[in-house]
Amino acid sequence: MSSKNTIISQLEAEQMSKEIPEFAPGDTVTVSVKVVEGSRERLQAFEGVVIAKRNRGLNSSFTVRKVSYGVGVERTFQTHSRLVDSINVKRRGDVRKAKLYHLRDLSGKAARIKEKLD
């Protein structure tokens, strides 16, 4: 018997059917999130740099960081969540680390990421 129950694996596969683009740490992405305000539901865009990505099947997540009015804002999204409407890759970044937590300490031009040319 495998390490995971086959029924659980089937249920997870059904929920992971949403099409998600390839992106990596260092990429600039726009995440459209469904926000419920009272009885209304709208889409809210969150654009920033992916500083971490966690690949765990249905439990996958990624963290996006942006600087808004001089304040650093980080938001962690569940990759396969129903609240995440779409993920758009705006720009590919050329980085050599999987986790870019060091960007938290940098500001201004020091926090820039080189664009991948290929």
Curated annotation (Swiss-Prot):
This protein is located at the 30S-50S ribosomal subunit interface and may play a role in the structure and function of the aminoacyl-tRNA binding site. This is Large ribosomal subunit protein bL19. It comes from the Bacteria. Belongs to the bacterial ribosomal protein bL19 family. It comes from Hahella chejuensis (strain KCTC 2396). One of its GO terms (biological process) is translation. Disulfide bonds: none annotated. The keyword Signal does not apply. NCBIfam families: rplS_bact (TIGR01024). Coiled coil: none annotated. SUPFAM superfamilies: Translation proteins SH3-like domain. InterPro entries: Ribosomal_bL19, Ribosomal_bL19_sf, Translation_prot_SH3-like_sf. GO terms for cellular component: cytosolic large ribosomal subunit. Keywords: Ribonucleoprotein, Ribosomal protein. One of its GO terms (molecular function) is structural constituent of ribosome.
